[in-house]
């Protein structure tokens, strides 16, 4: 058995939380229950990883089994990677019958026609999600199993979730393989990325609580009324109700999808009175603003009720789930009056 494969399996085990190693290995299914019972799971992770590697060596684990363990690990812990959302388009509205075996054949053939040194592994899950693991090599080197790309594709949908490897030069080939295998016409990257794969799915599949104009739900209204200090005057009470209503209209009344950042790029021209001659060159002013939080949308939702921001928040902040993007480019609208200016 290849020592490189044994070491890869050992390192994969090291990434798993110690209390969950047993459960992950059981899902893997390569080692029997009798073999797993011989492992002392109370020892250090280093010791556990060596025990697992030894059993795998005795059982002649191959690259396919090592790749399967890696897929299972990434499926259980998808937040360890950064995922980007891609959208595919068809030329017509017809819906093709999806054949998993045909999909795998086309995908593999498309990539291997351009690059021989590549390993591709598939795993289908109950929610119609196909997980694809690609380890890339070069025309002269073997595939690097530590620099993999991952693709998650739900059949019969136009959305693809890709976590690219550091070898981004292979990304166009990967996208082309997805288009060919799934019988679409083209593919483009959406401006939506996050560590939380499930939240990205919630956004593009519209599975989150969407904003809508409404009065207070009865239960929420009663809770608010019960918690109001009777000494608070009507003006403050009305303001709290206004903030609550606007917040509900902006974010809905359910939990928000989990995103960890939103990025805004501003590009505008510096405007001044022409006679001041402030700028010799008419270069645009560029600015990058990035909001980061373990749960950005919930953090934004809590700003107005906490008195840290005015309600309603800017649409640039509240439109993230509806527009399915957390990367924005803000450019100024062309002025109808070229001579107008804004003083600095």
Curated annotation (Swiss-Prot):
Source organism: Gallus gallus
Protein name as annotated: Centromere protein N
Record-level GO cellular component terms: chromosome, centromeric region; nucleoplasm
Function: Probable component of a centromeric complex involved in assembly of kinetochore proteins, mitotic progression and chromosome segregation.
InterPro entries: CENP-NAC/CAD_complex (IPR052011), Chl4/mis15/CENP-N (IPR007902)
Localization per Swiss-Prot or TrEMBL: Nucleus; Chromosome, Centromere
Domain of life from the UniProt record: Eukaryota
GO BP: CENP-A containing chromatin assembly; chromosome segregation
Gene name of the encoded protein: CENPN
Record-stated family: Belongs to the CENP-N/CHL4 family.
Keywords for this protein: Centromere, Chromosome, Nucleus
Key word Nucleus present: yes
Keyword Nucleus applies: yes
């Amino acid at each position: 058995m290849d020592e490189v494969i044994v070491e890869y399996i050992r390192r994969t085990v090291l990434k798993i939380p110690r209390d969950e190693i047993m459960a992950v290995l059981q899902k893997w299914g390569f080692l029997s229950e009798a073999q797993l019972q011989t492992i002392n799971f109370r020892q250090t992770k280093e010791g556990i990883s060596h025990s697992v590697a030894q059993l795998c060596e005795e059982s002649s684990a191959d690259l396919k089994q090592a790749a399967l363990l890696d897929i299972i690990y990434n499926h259980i812990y998808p937040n360890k990677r950064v995922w980007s959302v891609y959208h595919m388009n068809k030329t017509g509205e017809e819906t093709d019958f999806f054949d998993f075996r045909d999909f795998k054949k086309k995908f593999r053939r498309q990539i291997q026609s351009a690059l021989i040194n590549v390993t591709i592994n598939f795993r289908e899950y109950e929610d119609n999600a196909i997980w694809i693991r690609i380890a890339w090599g070069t025309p002269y080197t073997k595939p690097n199993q530590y620099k993999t790309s991952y693709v998650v594709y739900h059949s019969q949908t136009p959305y693809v979730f890709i976590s690219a490897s550091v070898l981004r030069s292979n990304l166009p080939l990967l996208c082309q393989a997805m288009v060919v295998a799934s019988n679409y016409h083209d593919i483009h990257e959406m401006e939506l990325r996050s560590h939380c794969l499930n939240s990205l799915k919630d956004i593009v599949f519209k599975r989150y609580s969407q904003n809508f104009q409404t009065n207070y739900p009865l239960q929420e209204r009663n809770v608010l009324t019960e918690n109001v200090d009777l000494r608070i005057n009507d003006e403050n009470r009305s303001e709290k109700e206004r903030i609550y209503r606007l917040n509900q209209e902006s974010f809905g009344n359910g939990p928000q999808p989990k995103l960890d950042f939103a990025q805004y790029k501003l590009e505008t021209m510096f405007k001044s009175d022409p006679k001041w001659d402030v700028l010799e060159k008419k270069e645009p002013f560029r600015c990058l603003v990035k909001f980061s939080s373990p749960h950005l949308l919930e953090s934004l939702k809590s700003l107005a009720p906490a008195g840290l921001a005015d309600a309603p928040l800017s649409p640039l902040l509240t439109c993230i789930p509806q527009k399915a993007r957390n990367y924005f480019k803000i450019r100024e609208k062309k002025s109808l009056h070229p001579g107008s200016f804004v003083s600095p």
